């Protein structure tokens, strides 16, 4: 069967795995520039310098510099993240199509943030104080390939020009928040889950500790731990056993009433 020249050109645009050949340019070192055209959260103009890597999972995960600018104040800040991802499907739409020329020319891709089905960042109240934090998704970087999240506290003082960003990525419980985390707004608690297998998982519950000092009002304290284990303190095998510890004055106190073997 003969293949015409146009068909041969079309085939030349794809790799053997069926992906566009220009994906090879997206090696984690080549920048893609994106400007979101809508005002985000009613107050931010955002653009991104992104270094997607087509060889990672999920495809296009990569470092990025996310630049925020307030629309009503002379405030700008940049968040650097390692696993930014918009999703390669976005670039299959004609208005956001990307190709080798777009990449080589460093053309800015103008995109509506609201068009992204699974947004790479969002704003949400992560510590029950009624103020929204900046939350950046790390796609598939959590345990068992769940999404993990970076949390940044936005500090402002009413009737002043004060504006500050606090990186909470090394502060518990914020540092271990992922798609398995449970938030209880009634009790002001966050429960972290650590997957270790059928009977080797654990949970930590943190309770919000409010402060009269606004700039330090974001902390939690560990109040309960639950461990599931199949060995005792001597290292001997035992039936799957649940251990519940309450944290009192910094000490772990076993709650024997609700601890014990499980089915």
Where are the regions a protein language model picked out?
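Structural signature of eukaryotic scaffold interfaces centered on beta-propeller domains
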Residues: 38, 117-128, 181-186
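Beta-propeller fold detector
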Residues: 79-81, 162-172, 221-227
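Repeat-based blade/solenoid architectures
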Residues: 88-120, 171-181, 235-237
């Amino acid at each position: 069967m003969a293949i015409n020249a146009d068909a041969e050109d079309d085939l030349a645009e794809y790799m053997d795995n069926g992906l566009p050949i220009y994906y090879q340019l997206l090696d984690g070192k080549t920048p893609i520039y994106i400007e979101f055209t809508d005002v985000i959260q009613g107050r931010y103009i955002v653009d991104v310098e992104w270094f997607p890597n087509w060889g990672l999972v999920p495809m296009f995960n990569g470092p990025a510099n996310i630049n925020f600018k307030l629309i009503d104040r002379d405030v700008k800040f940049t968040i650097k993240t390692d696993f930014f991802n918009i999703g390669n499907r976005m670039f299959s739409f004609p208005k956001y199509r990307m190709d080798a020329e777009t990449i080589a020319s460093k053309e800015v891709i103008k995109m509506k943030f609201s068009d992204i089905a699974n947004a790479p960042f969002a704003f949400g109240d992560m510590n029950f104080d009624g103020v929204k934090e900046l939350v950046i998704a790390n796609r598939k970087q959590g345990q068992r390939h769940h999404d993990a999240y970076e949390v940044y506290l936005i500090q402002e003082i009413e009737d002043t020009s004060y504006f500050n960003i606090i990186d909470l990525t090394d502060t518990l419980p914020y540092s271990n928040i992922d798609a398995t985390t449970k938030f209880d707004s009634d009790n002001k608690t966050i429960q972290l889950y650590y997957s270790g297998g059928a009977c080797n998982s654990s949970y930590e519950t943190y309770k919000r500790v409010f402060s009269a000092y606004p700039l330090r009002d974001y902390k939690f304290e560990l109040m309960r731990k639950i461990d599931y284990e199949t060995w005792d303190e001597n290292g001997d095998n035992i039936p799957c056993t649940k251990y519940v510890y309450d944290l009192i004055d910094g000490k772990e106190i076993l709650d024997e009433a609700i601890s014990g073997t499980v089915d």
